[in-house]
Amino acid sequence: MKLHKHRGQMSESLLTAAFIILSGGLQDAYTYLCRGKVFANAQTGNIVLCSAYLFDGQWRHSARYLIPVLSFLLGIFAAECIHRHFKYMEKVHWRQMIILAEIALLFAVGFLPQEANTFANAVVSFVCAMQVQTFRKVRGHAYARTMCIGNMRSGTEALCVYFHTHDREVLCKALTYFGVIGLFAIGAGLGALLSAHMAERGIWVSCALLAVSFFIMFIREEEKA
């Protein structure tokens, strides 16, 4: 049971999270810029556009934004099922199993042509949802690795508390949240460059980033064991 505790802590480390957050920003830029202006992570934006087209009577365009929303819900459901069935595995942590599944799915997306954008966006949204459900803390602080508004609120709140209390631990918390936002922005910028130069296959860099997190978790587990 002690080994499980260390693994959970490692999944919350900033080093592990950094590559996952970069991957998340990349995925959002990729689907928006390369796959028909649909968001992989920002489901609020998809819901707004889905409703706008729906009320305008453009059913086909509305469905284009509804599908990733439904896929996102399915991804959360799938991640929780994996957690419940495999949380006591000894050799491979259940979070690492999810990362492997994400890598396989995103790698397949890189082969899909523009004509399959709806399916590609659904797969990427599914992967993003699995990440949201699986990696929910960094340095012990709850965060969203794919959406910035919650991190902006938490970071600014912590910064305000620091100005009143001068508690350095609270300052560290604020900087962690703003660091997450910065990493996401860098990932989005990287996604824009890759979409321009590698087109559909740019998503493969996201696979590489996730693979780094996967192996970091292995290395650190061996050090703690």
What are the roles of these predicted feature ranges?
Residues 1-12:
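Short, Lys/Arg-rich, polar N-terminal cytosolic tail immediately upstream
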Residues 10-60, 131, 135-175:
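Small-residue-rich hydrophobic segments that form or flank transmembrane alpha-helices
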Residues 66-81:
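Central cavity-lining transmembrane alpha-helices of secondary-active solute carriers
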Residues 73-77, 181-189:
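Hydrophobic/small/kink-forming positions within alpha-helical transmembrane segments
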Residues 77-90, 195:
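Helix-to-loop junctions at the C-terminal end of transmembrane segments
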Residues 90-96, 189-208:
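A membrane-interface helix-boundary motif in multi-pass transporters
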